[in-house]
């Protein structure tokens, strides 16, 4: 018994114990770790398989960097979807971020909540509390939107949400042409319409 006690004491000294272990330092994992660690009594470990997001490949949003990130095994898991009849039995590339920030780090750091219909559909399938009206307050709680507060945004949360300062003329010309062709343009896909 004394030997077991010594082993246990050695293990606990060398390998710290945690109240919470979060696997994946994407947007959700980082937000959850932040919330849990706000209580000084909680010991929180946040694990991420990929590297830091402090690199020009992630921090400088431009088409070349996005292409590099999509193909990089350092920053991307390289998943492929299973072949489906509707896709001509092709296994499409499914980029998933492998870095601090997760998928937000490899998709131009775009913050998108998901479509209102999806949340309402989950609730209609029996998942009470997952309708859009029920989850929106949680999105608002963490958001600090540079555009300011509105029915769909908060300006006092812990996660900065800002518009890009990168402008790519071909993309802007494409969007302008879509508007001229009669397509509805939307400058806030986390607002009333997506």
Which stretches of residues belong to each language-model region?
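N-terminal redox-cofactor-binding region of secreted/periplasmic oxidoreductases
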Residues: 3, 7-194
């Amino acid at each position: 018994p004394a030997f077991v006690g010594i082993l246990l004491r050695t293990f606990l000294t060398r390998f710290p114990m945690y109240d919470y272990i979060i696997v994946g330092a994407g947007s959700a994992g980082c937000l959850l770790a932040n919330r849990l660690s706000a209580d000084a009594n909680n010991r929180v470990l946040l694990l991420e398989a990929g590297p830091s997001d402090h690199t020009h490949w992630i921090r400088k949003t431009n088409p070349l960097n996005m292409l590099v990130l999509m193909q990089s095994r350092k920053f991307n898991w390289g998943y492929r979807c299973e072949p489906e009849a509707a896709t001509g039995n092709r296994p499409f590339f499914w980029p998933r971020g492998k870095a601090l920030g997760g998928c937000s780090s490899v998709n131009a750091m775009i913050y998108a909540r998901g479509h209102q219909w999806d949340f309402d559909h989950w609730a209609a399938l029996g998942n009470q509390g997952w309708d859009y009206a029920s989850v929106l307050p949680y999105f608002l709680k963490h958001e600090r939107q540079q555009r300011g507060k509105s029915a769909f945004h908060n300006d006092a949360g812990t996660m900065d949400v800002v518009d890009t300062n990168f402008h790519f003329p071909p993309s802007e010309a494409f969007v302008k042409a879509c508007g001229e062709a009669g397509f509805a343009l939307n400058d806030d896909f986390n607002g009333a319409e997506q």
